[in-house]
Regions:
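Surface-exposed molecular-recognition determinants
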Residues: 1-191
Length: 191
């Protein structure tokens, strides 16, 4: 196992973020999307309007989630290449947003919830997160979001066209810290 931490805080956005338009070629030998760094999180948005948008992470391997839906994690549509980017098997034009984990910028966390009690989840940002997005991978759960402006008593419904709603349960009415965030007793974030 190779672990590439700790990492310096980025000084330029291009060190941790790349954007590329795919051509829908679906090649298994040439990456559809490539970044100048090994990306850790990937988001694909359909450029033709409508359709499904996907995201995946190096941590989850060749699995992906629908970003604008509740479906459980699936596989077979994309494949990570550790140094060259993302292979995507589709004939639709997508824009790929690629992110690299970095102190003070972005982290990817996977955990197993317990649904019975609140739980803290560790992260490696080194700063208090301003945005947290959570999606249960095993079943059809909604995407849940926390944002610093809305605070610990609200939940963002990422996959729905809803306003932030009151919820003292989702984040256990607890603000995140520079090392952990808290999930409450709800299946969307703790199952």
């Amino acid at each position: 196992i190779a672990i590439r931490r700790p990492m310096k805080t980025p000084t330029a956005g291009t060190e941790v973020f790349a954007l590329e338009n795919g051509n829908g070629g679906g090649s298994s030998t040439v990456p559809e999307f490539a970044a100048p760094f090994a990306s850790d999180l990937f988001y694909m948005q359909n450029r033709n309007g409508g359709g499904l948008n996907y995201n995946g992470s190096r941590l989850a391997g060749n699995s992906y989630l629908q970003f604008n839906g509740t479906a459980a994690e699936a596989s077979g549509l994309l494949r990570w290449d550790s140094m060259n980017g993302m292979y995507f098997y589709s004939t639709t034009d997508y824009t790929g947003y690629m992110f690299k984990r970095a102190t003070g910028f972005m982290d990817v966390v996977a955990y197993t919830g317990n649904f019975s009690t609140s739980a803290t989840q560790a992260h490696n940002l080194g700063v208090v997160p301003e945005l947290i997005l959570v999606k249960g991978r095993s079943q059809a759960y909604d995407w849940q979001g926390y944002s610093e402006p809305t605070g610990k008593g609200k939940v963002l419904w990422v996959d729905k066209n809803y306003q932030a709603t009151d919820s003292l349960v989702t984040w256990n009415n607890t603000s995140p810290t520079a090392s952990v965030f808290t999930v409450g007793q709800t299946a969307d974030v703790n199952a």
